[in-house]
Design a protein with these regions (language model features):
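Short, well-ordered alpha-helical segments enriched in acidic and aromatic residues
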Residues: 14-30
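Amphipathic alpha-helical repeat scaffolds
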Residues: 5-9
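A diffuse structural propensity rather than consistent per-protein peaks
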Residues: 15, 37-38
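A short gly/proline-enriched turn/hairpin at secondary-structure junctions
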Residues: 26-37, 50
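Short, well-structured alpha-helical segments
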Residues: 20, 38, 42-46
């Protein structure tokens, strides 16, 4: 299973155990201007899994842009809690054990066009 396939499996199956095993001890996650340690990230993901709907209900057009043994770059559309649609772009760096070591994501609001003609 590639790292991208593993990430998709974790998100779509709410596989917290696999996520916890995959995250390196010295991991941190940067989202826009916020940063979380491994423990903070895992706590947020546990909360997210417990209260979220199926990933396929709010994640669309998921795509791996690039992957090798050191990194993975991906994008997707995601409907946020505010109901707006955003383009998520992320980068994951892996350590020599293949665990995720650093992650960064940014989001950009996407204008959804409604054709009512």
């Amino acid at each position: 299973m590639t790292s991208y396939e593993k990430m998709i499996h974790i998100l779509h199956n709410k596989d917290f155990e696999l996520l916890e095993d995959w995250v390196a001890d010295d991991y941190f996650f940067v989202f826009e201007s916020q940063m979380w340690t491994r423990d903070e990230f895992l706590e947020r993901m546990k909360d997210f899994f417990s209260r979220s709907e199926k990933a396929s209900d709010f994640m669309f057009e998921e795509k791996c842009l690039y992957e090798n043994e050191d990194c993975m770059n991906y994008t997707r559309l995601e409907r946020q809690e505010d109901g707006e649609m955003y383009r998520v772009v992320g980068m994951v760096l892996k350590n020599s054990d293949g665990k995720i070591w650093r992650s960064i994501e940014r989001i950009t609001k996407v204008e959804v066009k409604n054709d009512t003609n």
